[in-house]
């Protein structure tokens, strides 16, 4: 087996919008980094209450 690829761990998933691997929001299968999520959360229907 040459060039085996890890399919587990924190670095496997990435942001759908920018490709960043840190600060990923995976809840509800969103898969956006926190920066992209803050930019488009309102368009997705999320509201800020406080």
Curated annotation (Swiss-Prot):
Stored InterPro entries: Ribosomal_uS14, Ribosomal_uS14_arc, Ribosomal_uS14_CS, RIbosomal_uS14_euk_arc, Ribosomal_uS14_sf
A Pfam family: Ribosomal_S14
Gene Ontology biological process terms from the UniProt entry: cytoplasmic translation
Gene Ontology cellular component terms for the protein in this record: cytosolic small ribosomal subunit
A Gene Ontology molecular function term of the record: zinc ion binding
Cofactor requirements of the protein: Zn(2+)
UniProt key word ATP-binding: no
UniProt keyword terms in alphabetical order: Metal-binding, Ribonucleoprotein, Ribosomal protein, RNA-binding, rRNA-binding, Zinc
Top-rank taxon: Archaea
CC cofactor note: Binds 1 zinc ion per subunit.
Reported function: Binds 16S rRNA, required for the assembly of 30S particles.
Subunit structure: Part of the 30S ribosomal subunit.
Family: Belongs to the universal ribosomal protein uS14 family. Zinc-binding uS14 subfamily.
UniProt name for this protein: Small ribosomal subunit protein uS14
Organism: Methanosarcina mazei (strain ATCC BAA-159 / DSM 3647 / Goe1 / Go1 / JCM 11833 / OCM 88) (Methanosarcina frisia)
């Amino acid at each position: 087996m040459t060039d085996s690829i890890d399919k587990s761990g924190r670095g496997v998933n990435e942001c759908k919008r920018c490709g960043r691997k840190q600060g990923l929001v995976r809840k509800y299968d969103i898969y956006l980094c926190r920066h992209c999520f803050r930019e488009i959360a309102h368009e997705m229907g999320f509201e800020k209450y406080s």
